[in-house]
Amino acid sequence: PSNPIVSVGTILAVPGVRAAIEASAAPVVAVSPIVGGAAIKGPAAPMLTALGYEVSARGVAQCYAGLIDALVIDQVDAALADDIRAMGIEVVVTDTIMRGPAEKRALAQAALDAARQVAA
């Protein structure tokens, strides 16, 4: 789960990158870096606020609207899933906090499963 503003946003700002992703037939999946209304780490929360987005998985979905096909969100934020789906974004709810290798593998698998789901 990367900061959608400074990590992913800077990559998307490279000329042609966003357009290439939007034009691709490949499924695009993001993992929300916001859990329970707070950033997992780093400055994502104040940056989302500064740009007018809610500090939530829903705000992350709004930030990525039109770009992603699916968003992996934490179980804590499961109540937001229907709001995100209403934006046309598929949602996978799982534990997104990576405490060790097993959790990292499980989150990666959830993202892959989301990609397969939207590609089907």
Predicted regions mapped to residue ranges:
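Conserved phosphate- and dinucleotide-binding cores of soluble alpha/beta proteins
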Residues: 5-63
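C-terminal functional extensions of proteins
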Residues: 41-120
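Hydrophobic, aromatic-enriched interface-forming segments
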Residues: 1-2
